[in-house]
Amino acid sequence: MSSLLEQLIEAFRVLPGVGQKSAQRMAYHVLEREREGGRRLAAALANAVEKVGHCVQCRDFTESEVCAICANSGRDRQQLCVVESPADRLAIEHATGYRGVYFILQGRLSPLDGIGPRELGLDRLAERLAAGEVTEMIIATNATVEGEATAHYLAQLARQHSVRPSRLAQGMPLGGELEYVDRGTLSHAFGTRSEVL
């Protein structure tokens, strides 16, 4: 096998969820059927890696120093929603009427993987909370072991700065049927049930 082909296969393997076989299929496809698409992909990738950075306020991806959401004076700066990734922020923007601002962790606490508070920019988050503008921190981390540990840490950080922490509700999906919901979700939903208003 050509060393250039091997390099291409290894390059595809940096993507999450892409193993040896998938990387090999992608490399063969680009070289056999999609050379022009491969050139566009290479140019777009090089351009993005060179020009896309992180917002100095929220850590989202942006081409400027401050992202469009943080620069928008119409957003409610008293509400700060903390999410694990830009994809989570996008999901909240599309599915809700949330008009506050965000802080993107770009991950979650995972000591075994060497990801601690510093890697998540929590020093910057603490500075933002200390400034006194934020009154509520909406913790929107995933319902995984690491996500829950991160949420606990964030709630403590919020309280240290006299900011009210809140957590996204978890439980039964809209339109879900009890018999098809996994045991963990059902147990959590049952344990955190609320009064019907």
From Swiss-Prot:
Function description: May play a role in DNA repair. It seems to be involved in an RecBC-independent recombinational process of DNA repair. It may act with RecF and RecO.
Family, per entry: Belongs to the RecR family.
PANTHER family: RECOMBINATION PROTEIN RECR
Tagged with keyword Ribonucleoprotein: no
Gene: recR
Organism: Xanthomonas campestris pv. campestris (strain ATCC 33913 / DSM 3586 / NCPPB 528 / LMG 568 / P 25)
UniProt GO molecular function: DNA binding; zinc ion binding
Keywords of this entry: DNA damage, DNA recombination, DNA repair, Metal-binding, Zinc, Zinc-finger
Pfam families in alphabetical order: RecR_C, RecR_HhH, RecR_ZnF, Toprim_4
Record carries keyword Zinc-finger: yes
Domain Toprim: 78-173
Entry protein name: Recombination protein RecR
GO BP of this protein: double-strand break repair; recombinational repair
ZnF (C4-type) intervals: 55-70
